[in-house]
UniProtKB/Swiss-Prot annotation:
E.C. no: 5.4.99.12
Quaternary structure and interacting proteins, as annotated: Homodimer.
tRNA processing recorded as keyword: yes
UniProtKB keywords: Isomerase, tRNA processing
Record lineage: Bacteria, Pseudomonadati, Thermodesulfobacteriota, Desulfovibrionia, Desulfovibrionales
Domain of life: Bacteria
CDD domains membership: PseudoU_synth_EcTruA (cd02570)
Role according to the record: Formation of pseudouridine at positions 38, 39 and 40 in the anticodon stem and loop of transfer RNAs.
Annotated catalytic residues: D57 (nucleophile)
GO BP, one annotated term: tRNA pseudouridine synthesis
Record flagged with keyword Isomerase: yes
SUPFAM superfamilies: Pseudouridine synthase
Encoding gene per record: truA
Name of the protein described by the UniProt record: tRNA pseudouridine synthase A
Enzyme class of the recorded protein, top EC level: isomerase
Length: 257
């Protein structure tokens, strides 16, 4: 069957992550994957399997999630972006869609992913419009966080920054970019919002949120930047920091060769 590749944006607040979660004798939890599968199945008249590039956690957002699904020949002429956006909840949007070779795989063919984590630095208030999308941290030592981030660049065993729950052959990953950019969303003179960007060939379970939690501890001067290599070398999650909240994280883009 023809394979449809599509790019998704969604607000993850109301969803229990990407992956379908079925529970015995209990209602199915709402997820991005299950919502997409139900809508597409209603259009083509039979069950489908949607595969996503990244299994975002509950509450995590996306601007550039990529997925694929196999479509019957009889539905080839549909404008899938329009059809899906007409049926999906308003907090899930199809940004782009196209047909690809049936060998394409949204998850297995991905070579890098880019995530963004938004921090709000004004300790006095958080704008209500931003509250669902930022972690309100108050003032932070951004220069110390910059220094700490340099120790995380490159290829490392990131098991100290992985939460339990996934069995993997390797916990070695390569971070090619880790940097921050200011945002002047509400002020022309002073920025209260900082976005951290994380680009790597792959991420372990909640790895981005764990790195963000660690960098915030550095920013609060509770950990020295120079301690980062020792945390990595310990290969023990207990030596790291608490996991940052899910709602500050957004999957920005998935890269393919």
């Amino acid at each position: 069957m023809p394979r449809l590749k599509f790019t998704l944006a969604y607000v993850g607040t109301a969803y229990h992550g990407w992956q379908t979660q079925r529970r015995k004798s209990l209602p199915e939890l709402p997820t991005i994957q299950s919502t997409l599968e139900k809508v597409i199945a209603s259009i083509i008249g039979k069950p489908v399997r949607v595969c996503g590039a990244g299994r975002t956690d509950a509450g995590v957002h996306a601007e550039g999630q990529v997925a694929h699904v196999d479509i019957p020949e009889s539905k080839l002429k549909l404008d899938w972006q329009l059809v899906l956006n007409a049926s999906l909840p308003k907090n899930i949007r199809v940004v782009h869609s196209l047909y690809v070779e049936d060998t394409f795989h949204a998850q297995h063919d991905a070579v890098q992913k880019l995530y963004a984590y938004r921090l709000w630095l004004n300790h006095r208030y958080t704008p209500p419009v931003l509250y669902p999308f930022v972690w309100s941290c108050g003032r932070l030592d951004l220069e110390a966080m910059d220094k700490a981030s340099t120790f995380l660049l490159g290829t490392h065993n990131f098991v100290s920054l992985q939460n339990r729950g996934t069995k993997l052959l390797s916990t070695v990953r390569t971070i090619s970019a880790l940097y921050r950019e200011p945002s002047q969303f509400f002020s022309l003179n002073e920025s209260h919002e900082v976005t951290w960007f994380f680009k790597a060939d792959g991420f372990l379970k909640q790895m981005v949120r764990n790195i963000m939690g660690l960098l915030v501890l550095v920013g609060r001067r509770k950990i020295q930047p120079e301690k980062i290599p020792y945390i990595l070398e310990a290969k023990d999650r207990r030596h790291s920091a608490p996991t940052a909240p899910a709602h500050g994280l957004t999957l920005k883009k998935v890269f393919y060769s």
